[in-house]
Regions:
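Conserved AMP-binding/adenylate-forming
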Residues: 1-72, 79-82, 101
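Short glycine/proline-enriched turns and hinge-like loops at secondary-structure junctions
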Residues: 19-23, 77, 124-126, 176
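AMP-binding/adenylate-forming catalytic core of the ANL superfamily
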Residues: 31, 36-37, 64-157, 181
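Phosphopantetheine-dependent thiolation modules in NRPS/PKS and related acyl-activating systems
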Residues: 176-191
Length: 191
């Protein structure tokens, strides 16, 4: 963060311990001019402003991130958008929809990507990627290419169970992908 006297660290959301380089956790920051709290809402204030072992008050942003050895912060999504899933080895893994989107958008055929997470028949969370691709591409061929790309660039547990091609990505009034509409579309087409 390019501001003087602003400190940033990544902590484990479960125990508050500082993460090592390149480990994903909650982004927290401390500065001499942080807010004192939410107006008439001490409960929410206590959820976001916490005193750490250094006796400083830190803002817990609710964002997931990691810091590399050069000090660069990478944003990974929101804490509320973390799901648990099982890999083929039966181990439990964290599933980050934004990680999937960030990788799939690198594919040259992909114009936009929105990822939702749904339970499958075994009640395990799986990713469903909605993808808008360049006009004129053959659907099954491009779907296969995107899946192949996902297998090459994502951990096994994060590979979308299904790639759904979409002609127009739905957006909210604040110009963000409308994940509720994607969930509704998925439910409607998979009854």
């Amino acid at each position: 963060i390019p501001l003087p006297k602003v400190n940033v660290k990544i902590v484990n959301p479960k125990d508050g311990q500082e993460q090592k380089y390149d480990e994903v956790g909650e982004v927290c920051f401390h500065a001499p001019n942080i807010m004192s709290g939410y107006f008439k809402n001490p409960k929410e204030t206590d959820n976001i402003i916490k005193t750490h072992a250094d006796n400083k008050k830190w803002i817990h942003t609710g964002d997931l991130g990691s810091v590399d050895q050069e000090g660069f912060l990478t944003f990974h999504g929101r804490i509320k958008k973390i799901y648990l899933t099982k890999g083929s080895d039966n181990n439990v893994y964290k599933l980050f929809p934004m990680q999937i989107e960030n990788e799939l958008i690198k594919n040259e055929e992909v114009l936009e990507c929105g990822t939702i997470v749904v339970p499958d028949q075994e009640k395990i969370h799986v990713a469903i990627a909605f993808v808008r691709v360049k006009v004129g591409l053959e659907k099954e061929t491009v779907r296969g290419k995107i899946l192949e790309f996902a297998r090459a660039h994502l951990p096994e547990h994060a590979i979308p169970k299904k790639i759904m091609l979409i002609e127009k990505m739905p957006y909210t009034q604040s110009n963000k992908i409308d994940y509720k509409k994607l969930e509704e579309k998925y439910q409607k087409e998979n009854r």
